[in-house]
Amino acid sequence: VKSCFERYGYAPIETPAMENIETLTGKYGEEGDRLIFKILNSGDFLSKSKIDKKTTSKSLSVDIANKALRYDLTVPFARFVVNNQNDITFPFKRYQMQNVWRADRPQKGRFREFYQCDADVIGSKSLFNEIELIQLCDDIFSDLNIPNVEILINNRKILSAMIEMMSSTNIFNDFVIILDKLEKIGIENVKNELVKIGVQKDKLNILDSFLNIRDVNDLKALLNDSEIGNKGVAELDFIIKKIDKLSLKNSEVKFDISLARGLNYYTGSIFEVKSSDINIGSIAGGGRYDDLTSIFGLNDVSGVGISFGIDRIFLVMDELNLFPKNIDVSSQVLFLNFGEEEASYCLALLKQLRENNINSELYPTDDKIKKQMNYANKKRVQFVVMIGEDEIKSGELTIKDM
């Protein structure tokens, strides 16, 4: 993954595991905010808080926690860009490979701590960036030999037009969060939740009409004269037509009108990546954010990025038996230890092997040979080298192919 990022011209950065809590909250929606791991302040801050029966955990957390573990890599990246804007060459292409934390219930494909690999371009509104990220995604999964990858694509501007036709109130963020749960809770429950946030029942047929759309061009008739909706269609159409001419290796790009991505900061193209062979949810996802840096004081800086969930990708590779058989082999060669003189003789040979990029090690103590050989077997070492008194005298080695 790292080599593919660098092949596309992305440079690495890292950000702290902890962020000020106000940096993170309000960027992921109400549900996302609940999953942020808060860090208790040092000292007895609780004694200074006014606690009574009306005190809620939310109001109390303001007094006792002003730091949190990062929820994703995108929001800290936006802060990084603002803090370093005078030293950055725009458009700025960065990749970042670090852990993130979610206060979630652990289950298959869901983790409280997991590894994300992000690639973003910021400081450019060009849709060619979206096209490049789709190519990057295809190359990464091709390099990993993961077949039958689906890249689902939609545009937040189209979703904005949908909710404008269904409701006169500004409930877009709530609408996106509800629509994002369609696959999990089903269409009827989605409709029930939309009614709860103010959508009239006689407007729900508009949702049905949109969800029946399979082709981008068919959207135009439904959107009528919606300026923002038609702009979203034009952006989608541009990306899909360019991608169709590129002949992707392992991936297929599909338009999915129900794709919403529940994070508040997306404003344009959104995409989600799944394995057609393994039902584990998304293994990558991302989108366009036009004003994320503005919350930190830097306006009119658009960005787009994609995030790869490495832990889920590992699960897919494991289910499909894609890991090489020697993936957990740390040493190719093990020198057995017959005593101080023999071990000292091995050191120069070890140095030569390592200088030639051959992973090798010396067993540290002169334990029984059976114990040393068991060590080699458990570590799946390919070759064992035995140098005793006779081998030192003759200048020859005894090598066992394991």
Where do the protein language model's features map onto the residues?
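Positively charged, Gly/Ser-enriched RNA/tRNA-binding surfaces
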Residues: V1-Y8, E19-E22, T55-I64, D72-I88, ...
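A short beta-strand-loop structural module common to alpha/beta enzyme folds
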Residues: A11-A17
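Polyanion/phosphate-binding surface patch
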Residues: M18-K67
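Acidic, His- and aromatic-enriched active-site or binding-groove loops in soluble protein domains
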Residues: G32-K48, S168-V190, S275-S276
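Short, conserved phosphate-binding/catalytic loop or strand-edge motifs used
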Residues: F111-C117, I153-A161
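Hydrophobic mid-domain F-helix/FG-region of cytochrome P450s
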Residues: L136-D143, K157-M166
